[in-house]
């Protein structure tokens, strides 16, 4: 896995959410085509959610092979702090959950755009741009 820190000069433009990659691994041609046109990364939460969702060993190995080729943003103290701020601001009013807060915080801290089918889960966070593939 290509671990990317905020100090690295090689940056992705987009962070892809779990639901998009789930469709990719399910063989969605439109998603595969879309992902082939953008420079994207994943973060720790997306990686864990995909690993958790792959029940069969073969499926998990396939997913891990693909994920190992992607840019990857690990959790950092800055991301954790931003996620806490987002939870404080949006958890009660908008129902923001921890995984989505960590995804949004990664997007904010690395100045990315979020690619997700779950636009409603993030639309109230004004600091990020959300794109539906």
Task: Map each language-model feature to its residues.
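Active-site neighborhoods of divalent-metal-dependent phosphate/nucleic-acid chemistry enzymes
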Residues: 2-12, 72-120
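Short loop/helix-cap segments at secondary-structure boundaries that form the rim of catalytic
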Residues: 31-35, 120-127
């Amino acid at each position: 896995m290509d671990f990317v820190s905020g100090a690295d000069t090689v940056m992705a433009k987009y962070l892809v959410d779990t639901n998009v990659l789930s469709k990719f691994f399910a063989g969605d041609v439109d998603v595969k085509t879309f992902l082939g046109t953008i420079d994207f990364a994943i973060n720790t939460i997306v990686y864990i959610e995909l690993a958790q969702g792959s029940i069969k060993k073969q499926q998990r190995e396939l997913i891990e092979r693909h994920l190992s080729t992607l840019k990857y943003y690990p959790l950092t103290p800055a991301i954790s702090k931003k996620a806490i701020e987002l939870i404080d601001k949006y958890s009660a009013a908008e129902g923001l959950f921890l995984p989505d807060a960590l995804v949004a915080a990664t997007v904010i801290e690395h100045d990315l755009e979020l690619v997700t089918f779950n636009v409603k889960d993030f639309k109230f966070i004004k600091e990020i741009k959300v794109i539906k593939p």
